[in-house]
Amino acid sequence: MANSKAVTCQIRYTLNLNKLSAFESYARTWMMLIERYGGTHHGYFLPRAAPDGAEISFPGLGNDGPGDVAVAMFTFPDEQSYRRYRQMVKTAPERQSAAALVRETRCFTRYERLFLKPVQRA
């Protein structure tokens, strides 16, 4: 029986900060592709300076992260929808263009993905 739980994925990119406009173009392409194939894209988030006076809530436990990391997050309604997207996006011309952009510009140097589930409210 297929799992009907939503599939939420967070992707963290290590950016080449000299190629931000190329990365933004890449990001816009993937937002469109995710939504074309039935997902909800929650956006790409680029690094920025911390607000003045922003302190770590738990000194000794936390620290500010690196300034070259971008984050994206998207959700598909269920695993079947996610698998269908993965199959269909393989042949999308825009995916091929986005892959070529990354190869040509090296707008990011690595990425990692996390599959997540929400904490239910009490």
Task: Name every feature range the model reports, one short phrase each.
Residues 1-3, 121-122:
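Basic/polar N-terminal segments that are highly enriched at the extreme N-terminus
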Residues 116-119:
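Specificity-determining recognition surfaces
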Residues 2, 25-42, 59-69, 73-113:
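An amphipathic, aromatic/His-enriched active-site/gating alpha helix that lines ligand/cofactor pockets
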Residues 48-61:
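A cross-kingdom feature marking solvent-exposed beta-strand/loop segments within repeated
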Residues 16-23:
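Short, surface-exposed ligand-recognition loops at beta-strand->loop->(often short) alpha-helix junctions
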Residues 7-14, 71:
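Active-site-flanking beta-strand signature of metal-NTP-handling nucleotidyl enzymes
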Residues 17, 48, 78-80:
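Feature marks short, surface-exposed loop/turn motifs that line or immediately flank catalytic pockets
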